[in-house]
């Protein structure tokens, strides 16, 4: 891979890729899809930096952040990587895209786990993988 290809891929990751959320019980699609930016995108970098700042601000005088506080901030950070959410008729109801609604969706641990795993797996963002 050339330096130019590496830069081009990082820019391409800004467009995101589709993560189809599947049931944790039988692996079938839920009808919910998330468009998530790649780990090398500018958006992901900015979200990581913002998370570090937020963790520092949330720390007590001993430099500690509660488990609940840390989880909330990590969910907020992951939500910043989601460009779009679609929900088809099998999902039951339409999804109104907003940061707050994405955060609510990601509070479901098995959805958050899938989104986080997808966002961190560079194979999903390989050159030529745009979907």
Which functions belong to the PLM regions below?
Residues 1-15:
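Extended acidic low-complexity intrinsically disordered regions
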Residues 9, 24-26, 72:
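Generic marker of residues within folded, mature protein domains
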Residues 15-27:
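Short acidic-hydrophobic surface loop/beta-edge motif
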């Amino acid at each position: 891979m050339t330096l130019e290809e590496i830069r081009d891929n990082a820019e391409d990751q800004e467009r995101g890729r589709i993560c189809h959320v599947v049931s944790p019980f039988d692996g079938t699609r839920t009808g919910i899809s998330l468009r998530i930016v790649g780990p090398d995108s500018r958006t992901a970098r900015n979200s990581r930096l913002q998370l570090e700042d937020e963790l520092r601000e949330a720390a007590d005088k001993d430099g500690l952040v509660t488990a609940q506080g840390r989880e909330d901030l990590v969910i907020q950070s992951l939500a910043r990587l989601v460009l779009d959410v679609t929900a088809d008729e099998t999902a039951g109801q339409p999804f109104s895209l907003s940061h707050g609604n994405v955060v609510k969706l990601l509070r479901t641990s098995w959805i958050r786990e899938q989104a986080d795993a997808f966002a961190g797996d560079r194979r999903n963002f390989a050159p030529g993988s745009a979907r």
